[in-house]
Amino acid sequence: MELNELPQMDPRALKATSVKAEDEHANSAEPQALKITAASSNPKMFTLPWHKPLATWPKDLLANLPRGISRHVVRFVHVGDEVYAMKEITRQVAEREYEILRRLQKLELPTVTPIAVVIGRHTREGEPLEAILVTRHLKFSLPYRALFARNLRPDTAERLIDALAVLLVRLHLAGFYWGDVSLSNVLFLRDADAFSAFLVDAETGDLQAQLTDGQREYDIDLARTNIIGELMDLASGKLLPGDVDEIEVGNRLVDRYHSLWSTLTDTDKFNPDEMWKIEQRVNKLNELGFDVDELEMKTAEDGKRVLVRPR
C-alpha cells in the first residue's frame, strides 16, 4: 500500500521522516512537517494522532498501566505489538534527553530504551504542539507509589532505597550527573527478594568523562531530600507503614551509597597469604550487580602487602 493511501493517517505524516538522530548543530528551526527522529523505524508510528495534544489521545490507543508522578503529560500507548511511554515536552529537552538515554544504553546502564523524538507537531488548525519523547515501556516495572499501594513487606522502603543506591553508583561511575535524583524518576523491577532500579527521566542529566566529588555529593544530598519528601507524601496518604521513619530511610540512601562507592573504588591492602579476600570482595560486588572485569594489583612499598582495586 502506498503511504498516501493509508487510512487514519495524520496528514502531516505524509511529509514525515524517520531518521537517525541529527548532529547537534543541525538547524534548530521548528519544522513545518511532522518529523520522527528514531534509531529504527516503526511504520505504526506514522498512524498515531500526532495532531492532537497527548492528553486528548483516544482511549483505545492507551495502555492502562500505573504512571508515576511527572511534571509533564505522560501516556502509555499501544504501537503495534509494543507499548511505548510518551512524554510531551519541549523540543530542546526531548532531543537532549533522547540523546542522553541513547548514550547511557550504549554503556549498558539500567535505563529505559529511547525509541524516538517527534517534533513538528501541529493541530488541524496549524497551532504548534510540544514535542514527544518516546521510550519503550519496561515490562513488569512499577513506579514506587504503585508498589506502596500493594500489600508488600514492611521493609519495602529500605529495599527500594538499596536499589536506588546501586543505580546511582553505577550512573556516577559512568560519569552521569543526574541532577534530579528521586524515587519518582525511577522504575522498579522485582528481583527475587530485592528490587532493581531503572532510570526513566534524564531531563536534567549530563554525561561527562568523570564526575567531581562535589557533583556526586550534590546528587546524593538532593536524593536524600527528595526521598524524605516523597515518603512523607506517602505517609500522608496512608500508604507508608506507620513504623517507617522517613528521615532514617533518606539517610540510609546516603550510607548505602558511600558504602558501595567505597567498596568499588577504594584500594584494599592484603598480605600475600590473604589473597582469598580478593575473591571475597569480587563475589560481594558481583552479588550487587557489578561485573568486575579486571583487578589492578601491585605490591606495596614495604613489599609485604598487595594493593587491590577493581577497574
Spell out what each predicted region is.
Residues 1-21, 111-117, 157, 212, ...:
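A broadly tuned "polar low-complexity/structure-edge" signature
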Residues 1-66, 79-81, 91-97, 107, ...:
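Regulatory N- and C-terminal appendages and interdomain linkers associated
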Residues 43-158, 162-179, 226-234:
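Conserved ATP-binding subdomain of kinase catalytic cores across diverse folds
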Residues 116-117, 183, 297:
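Proline- and acidic/polar-enriched loop/turn elements at helix boundaries
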Residues 140, 216-219, 223, 246-249, ...:
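Alpha-helical structural motif
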Residues 150-162, 214-227, 270-289:
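Hydrophobic transmembrane alpha-helix bundles
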Residues 177, 183-233:
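Catalytic activation segment of kinase domains across protein kinase-like and atypical kinase folds
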